[in-house]
């Protein structure tokens, strides 16, 4: 299976590094290219043991999956450059936010199978939650192959293209929202008199430990919370204080704003 990556930004790097580390593919079957900075691309490709090239015809020849990882505003120029080199074997996987399947196909002047994926930065540690939507002509075998590729850097959830906006908000932007919550937790902790570095290190380990509890347990998060909440205890007192605030409404506002912005960005390709 030959894979080609157009674009070598942070997200693209996380994805193809995860795929390489999974040992499911021969690195010799992976090809990288970017818009410029050949020296950096050469060094990175050699570090990973993969190929690099700026020859679009050679890249696309016999390529099974072509990842489109350029910045959205650079895509039209890329499409204009490669559209005459596209072959029937090429299936496209876009990680470009906001660009619809129809728009990408129109710019590439092709009806080849195309999938849109929305990973998050946790792909860098093999734990992305990636939303995916397939064009109607993406066959079952090809879907299985793509899902296997994505599982190399996390988990996958298949949704309709319209629902990628919600996935973008909940999991795509989710790490940043959680980081923000943890930031506030650190600030609040320092107000209790402990040193900031003590609080930050404690909360880092708290997050890691809690994540492992969630991962290893079959219980819901609600039940896990109840299991450590004693009536009349300190945890109950803190939860009672939290219950004075409508946290659901706060997160609904947060997620709705992200969904609306995703929709706005997608409308720019009309």
Task: Please give the residue ranges for each predicted region.
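NAD(P)+-binding Rossmann beta1-loop-alpha1 motif at the extreme N-terminus of oxidoreductases
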Residues: 1-54, 127-128, 190-191
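Short acidic capping loops at alpha-helix termini that bridge into adjacent secondary structure
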Residues: 26-30, 88-90, 112, 197-198
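Small-residue helix-packing motif on alpha-helices
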Residues: 30, 59, 195-202, 224
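Rossmann-like NAD(P)(H) cofactor-binding subdomain of soluble oxidoreductases
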Residues: 37, 47-48, 56-132
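Short acidic-hydrophobic, aromatic-tinged amphipathic segments that line or gate anion-handling sites
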Residues: 51-58, 157-159
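Internal alpha-helical scaffold of NAD(P)-dependent oxidoreductase catalytic cores
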Residues: 103-113, 129-166, 179-216, 261
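NAD(P)-dependent Rossmann-like dehydrogenase/reductase catalytic/cofactor-binding core
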Residues: 204, 208-270
């Amino acid at each position: 299976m030959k894979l080609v990556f157009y674009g070598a930004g942070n997200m693209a790097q996380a994805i193809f590094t995860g795929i390489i580390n999974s040992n499911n593919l021969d690195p010799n079957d992976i090809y990288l290219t970017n818009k410029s900075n050949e020296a950096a691309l050469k060094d990175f490709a050699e570090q990973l043991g993969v190929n690099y090239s700026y020859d679009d015809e050679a890249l696309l020849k016999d390529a099974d999956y072509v990842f489109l990882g350029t910045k959205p505003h650079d895509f039209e120029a890329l499409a204009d450059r490669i559209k005459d080199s596209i072959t029937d074997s090429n299936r496209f996987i876009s990680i470009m936010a906001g660009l619809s399947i129809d728009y990408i196909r129109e710019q590439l002047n092709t009806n080849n199978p195309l999938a849109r994926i929305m990973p998050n930065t946790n792909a860098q540690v093999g734990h992305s939650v990636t939303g995916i939507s397939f064009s109607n002509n993406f066959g079952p075998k090809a879907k299985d192959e793509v899902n296997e590729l994505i599982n190399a850097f996390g988990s996958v959830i298949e949704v309709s293209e319209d629902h990628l906006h919600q996935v973008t908000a909940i999991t795509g932007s989710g790490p940043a929202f959680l980081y923000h919550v943890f930031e506030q937790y650190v600030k609040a902790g320092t107000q209790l008199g402990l040193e900031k570095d003590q609080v930050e290190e404690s909360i880092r380990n708290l997050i890691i430990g809690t994540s492992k509890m969630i991962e290893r347990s079959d219980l819901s998060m609600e039940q896990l919370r109840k299991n450590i909440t004693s009536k009349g205890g300190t945890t109950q007192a803190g939860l009672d204080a939290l219950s004075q605030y409508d946290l659901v409404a706060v997160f609904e506002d947060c997620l709705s704003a992200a969904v609306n912005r995703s929709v706005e960005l997608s409308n720019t390709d009309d």
